[in-house]
C-alpha cells in the first residue's frame, strides 16, 4: 500500500492556493495528527519495551506483533510530520535543503511505505504462526527463535526491496522559489502516470491482496479446526483441553481484530486511490477534505494497534504493569534487577510476580 508514492496526487492541498483553508481547519487537522502521533509513539514503544524486557512474553506471536509495532513507529516518525507540513505549507512542500534534504526526500516516503508493508506481512506471519500452533502444537512448542528472527528479517528485506525504486523516483524540484519533493519515473518511463498505475497495481497485488487472501485462508482453517476440537479427547484431561482452547481462542481473537482494523483503516484510502487513478484522473479541490480523511484514517492505524493489543491481551497488560511498576520504584532496571518469578502457569498465559531490589 504505497501511500506516499501517491501522496502528490491525493494530498489535502490539491487546490492552487495551499493557504485558502481556514486557520481553524488547519489547527484541527494538526491537533488530530498530534494526538495520534503521541499515542502511536507511546503505545508502540510500550509494546516493544514490554516484549523485549519480559522473556516470558517472547513467544513467536508476540515477537511478530512487536515487529509490527516497530514498523508502526515509522509512521509518527516520518509520515505524520510530513503530513503536518503539507497541512500548513501545501502539497509536497519540502523545507529541508541540500544533500540532507534530498536524502530525506527519498527516505521519508520509503520508510513510510515500508512501515505498511512490514505491518501486513507481520499479520501474515501471525496467521501462519497461529495455523502452525493449532495444527502442529507439538512441533510449535520447539520452534526455534532463529526461525522467528529469519522470518522478521525476510519481511523487512522484502519491504525494502519492493520499495527501493523510491530512492530513484523521488527528487526535489524548485518551483517558484520553493522546494517540492516529487516523484518522477522519467527517465526511463516517459508516461509518469502510467508508470505509477502499473507500480501501484503490482504493490497492491503483492503486499495487500496476496497477504490478505493468505491470512483469510489460514484463519478460516484455524477456526474450523478449533470448532472441531471442542469435542473432548480421550488423551487429554478436561482441564488441560479447556486451558489450551482458551489460550488459542484468546490469541486468535486478538489476531483477527488486528486484521479487521487494518482492513477498515486502509480500505478507504485504497478505494480513493483506485478512483483517482482509474476514474477521476485528477483529484479535484472539492475532494481535498475526503483525501485528508482517508489518509488520516490510514495513518491512525499505528495508534489503534497498541490500543487493541492492550484491550485484548491480558498477558501484555500484566507485563506492562510489571515493567512500569519496576521502573517507577527507581530501585531497579527491568532487564537486570527485576526478578520475575512464576506463581501460576496456564499454557503461555503465565501469571508472574516482580520483585525489585
Question: For the regions a protein language model found, what residue spans apply to each?
Answer:
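First transmembrane helix
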Residues: 25-54
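Intracellular effector-coupling site of seven-transmembrane GPCRs
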Residues: 183-192, 204-207, 224-269
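Hydrophobic alpha-helical segments of membrane proteins
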Residues: 74-84, 161-164, 168, 209, ...
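Intrinsically disordered regulatory tails of 7TM GPCRs
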Residues: 1-18, 228-252, 314-357
Amino acid at each position: 500500500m504505497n501511500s506516499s508514492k501517491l501522496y502528490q496526487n491525493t494530498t489535502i492541498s490539491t487546490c492552487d492556493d495551499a493557504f485558502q483553508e481556514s486557520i481553524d481547519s488547519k489547527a484541527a487537522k494538526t491537533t488530530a495528527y498530534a494526538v495520534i502521533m503521541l499515542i502511536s509513539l507511546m503505545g508502540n514503544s510500550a509494546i516493544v519495551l514490554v516484549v523485549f524486557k519480559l522473556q516470558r512474553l517472547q513467544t513467536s506471536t508476540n515477537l511478530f506483533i512487536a515487529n509490527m509495532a516497530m514498523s508502526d513507529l515509522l509512521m509518527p516518525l516520518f509520515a505524520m510530520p510530513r503530513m503536518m507540513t503539507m497541512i500548513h505549507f501545501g502539497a509536497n512542500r519540502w523545507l529541508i535543503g541540500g544533500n540532507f534534504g534530498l536524502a530525506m526526500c527519498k527516505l521519508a516516503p520509503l520508510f513510510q511505505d515500508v512501515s505498511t508493508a512490514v505491518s501486513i506481512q507481520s499479520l501474515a506471519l501471525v496467521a501462519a504462526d497461529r495455523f502452525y500452533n493449532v495444527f502442529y502444537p507439538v512441533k510449535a512448542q520447539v520452534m526455534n527463535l532463529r526461525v522467528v528472527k529469519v522470518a522478521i528479517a525476510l519481511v523487512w528485506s522484502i519491504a525494502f526491496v519492493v520499495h527501493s525504486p523510491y530512492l530513484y523516483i523521488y527528487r526535489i524540484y524548485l518551483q517558484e522559489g520553493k522546494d517540492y519533493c516529487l516523484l518522477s519515473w522519467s527517465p526511463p518511463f516517459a508516461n509518469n502516470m502510467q508508470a505509477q498505475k502499473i507500480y501501484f497495481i503490482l504493490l497492491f497485488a503483492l503486499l495487500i491482496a496476496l497477504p490478505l487472501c493468505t491470512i483469510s485462508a489460514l484463519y478460516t482453517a484455524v477456526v474450523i479446526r478449533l470448532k472441531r476440537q471442542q469435542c473432548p479427547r480421550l488423551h487429554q484431561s478436561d482441564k488441560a483441553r479447556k486451558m489450551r482452547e482458551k489460550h488459542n481462542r484468546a490469541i486468535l481473537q486478538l489476531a483477527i481484530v488486528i486484521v479487521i482494523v487494518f482492513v477498515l483503516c486502509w480500505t478507504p484510502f485504497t478505494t480513493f486511490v483506485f478512483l483517482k487513478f482509474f476514474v477521476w484522473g485528477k483529484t479535484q479541490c472539492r475532494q481535498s477534505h475526503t483525501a485528508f480523511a482517508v489518509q488520516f484514517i490510514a495513518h491512525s492505524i499505528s495508534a489503534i494497534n497498541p490500543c487493541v493489543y492492550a484491550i485484548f491481551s491480558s498477558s501484555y497488560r500484566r507485563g506492562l504493569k510489571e515493567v512500569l511498576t519496576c521502573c517507577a520504584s527507581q530501585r531497579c532496571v527491568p532487564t537486570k534487577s527485576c526478578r520475575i518469578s512464576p506463581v501460576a502457569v496456564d499454557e503461555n498465559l503465565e501469571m508472574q510476580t516482580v520483585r525489585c531490589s
